């Protein structure tokens, strides 16, 4: 039982000096109800911010309460934002665009492969988000 969230992407929350940030941001936060469930529904949260700002490590996105009350596993995703996540230069392989969406896709694949070890059901996964996160959900469908 640890209570640790991982840092978001630099530049995403520069206005909030108390937010832990790092370029090494491709982490998931996972909250599991106690006792550990068997075959629980999984809810994956994608934060918003216009694809320019945001991080899943803000206290407002803590999934601990939702996991405990609803007996679900909550996963929040960090992804690259701003130019390093969404800059597109047509014809340039160095900046193909939408890397932030690929980060999210990697997180979804990780959940499919690994969530059973946490007591989750990979066949019962719900994506949800707000603002650009909700837009991301639509793009992954």
Curated annotation (Swiss-Prot):
Keywords: Disulfide bond, Glycoprotein, Hydrolase, Phosphoprotein, Secreted, Serine esterase. Esterase with broad substrate specificity. Contributes to the inactivation of the neurotransmitter acetylcholine. Can degrade neurotoxic organophosphate esters. SUPFAM superfamilies: alpha/beta-Hydrolases. It comes from the Eukaryota. It comes from Canis lupus familiaris (Dog). This is Cholinesterase. It catalyses: an acylcholine + H2O = a carboxylate + choline + H(+). Substrate binds at residues 49-50. GO terms for cellular component: extracellular region. Belongs to the type-B carboxylesterase/lipase family. The active site is at 131 (acyl-ester intermediate). It is found in: Secreted. The gene is BCHE. Homotetramer; disulfide-linked. Dimer of dimers. GO terms for molecular function: acetylcholinesterase activity; cholinesterase activity. Glycans are attached at residue 39. Present in most cells except erythrocytes. The keyword Disulfide bond applies. The modification Phosphoserine is found at residue 131. Its EC number is 3.1.1.8. The lineage of its organism: Eukaryota, Metazoa, Chordata, Craniata, Vertebrata. The keyword Coiled coil does not apply.
